[in-house]
Design a protein with these regions (language model features):
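Cyclic nucleotide-binding regulatory module and flanking cytosolic helices
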Residues: 1-36, 80, 85-86
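Cyclic nucleotide-binding regulatory domains
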Residues: 13, 38-101
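Short aromatic/basic micro-patch
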Residues: 16, 74, 98, 106, ...
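A generic structural signal for short hydrophobic patches within well-formed alpha-helices
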Residues: 22, 112-113, 218
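Structural motif
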Residues: 57, 101-103, 178, 209
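Cyclic-nucleotide recognition modules
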Residues: 73-131, 135
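Polybasic "coupling" helices that flank or enter modular domains
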Residues: 99, 117-187, 200
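Phosphate-/nucleic-acid-contacting segments
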Residues: 149, 160-235
Length: 235
């Protein structure tokens, strides 16, 4: 099992920081364990710090007045979440839940701001991560508002390919129900689209592994799903 220092030093948010600073960051971190399905924080809870996934997986989501859940993002090992309140001192804008047994490193806001004051390079790292997060949410809004579900799915599969550093296949690390919520659709629609992609020779699915048979076709679909016969009218 990786040590807290190894996890911190391997995280993008702390990339390039010298060993002494990493040790100081480790000293303010608090290790917290969560069971599958356990809530980490609720929307409107006071943002008194942020988290880094050491082990497991966490989903960030919102719930509509009717009870419909919309997953906004899923974070795995080495990824931070809940960073915005560190700077704003405001409340969390969404909910966070462990979707598998997880261990998180929690960084209290007051202690972390003290480190940022002492080490401006840490602030630059935080800004880089926040900038990346903004781009991710911009792409997500674009996908949900302008693209049909097949294009959203193709774009997400290609995104996972980049994240997992694999050209020919990816491994789904969340359930199909969770993937459907992330894409703004329902499991039945997602299953139909996956089946059509299989029949058209774009992909081959086996359990949680999806092999790319026609990557160019996926790239084309991700850009303009409306011109592809995979388009679904159902949300």
């Amino acid at each position: 099992m990786a040590s807290d220092l190894d996890i911190i030093s391997g995280a993008l948010i702390f990339d390039g920081l010298p060993g002494k600073q990493l040790e100081q960051i480790k000293d303010v971190a608090i290790s917290k364990n969560y069971t599958r399905g356990e809530i980490i924080f609720m929307e409107q809870d006071m943002g008194n710090g942020f988290y880094l996934v050491a082990e497991g997986m966490v989903k960030i989501f919102k719930v509509s007045p009717s009870g419909k859940e919309q997953i906004l993002h899923v974070f795995g090992p080495g990824e931070p979440f809940g960073e915005v309140p560190v700077f704003s001192g405001k409340r969390f804008p969404a909910n966070a839940e462990a979707i598998r047994k997880s261990r998180l490193l929690f960084f209290p806001r007051t202690a972390f701001l003290g480190l940022i004051t002492a080490h401006p390079s840490l602030a630059l790292n935080m800004l880089a991560v926040l900038s990346m997060r903004l781009r991710q949410f911009t792409h997500q809004i674009e996908n949900l508002s302008l693209k049909e579900v097949p294009a959203r799915l193709a774009a997400y599969l290609l995104y996972l390919s980049t994240e997992q550093k694999r050209e020919d296949f990816i491994t789904l690390d969340i359930s199909k129900g969770q993937l459907a919520s992330l894409l703004g659709t329902i499991p039945e629609t997602l299953s139909r689209i996956l089946n059509r992609m299989n029949k058209q020779g774009l992909i081959e699915t086996k359990d949680r592994t999806i092999r790319f048979l026609n990557r160019e076709g996926l790239e084309s679909l991700s850009i303009d799903g409306k011109k592809n016969e995979l388009m679904e009218k159902n949300p």
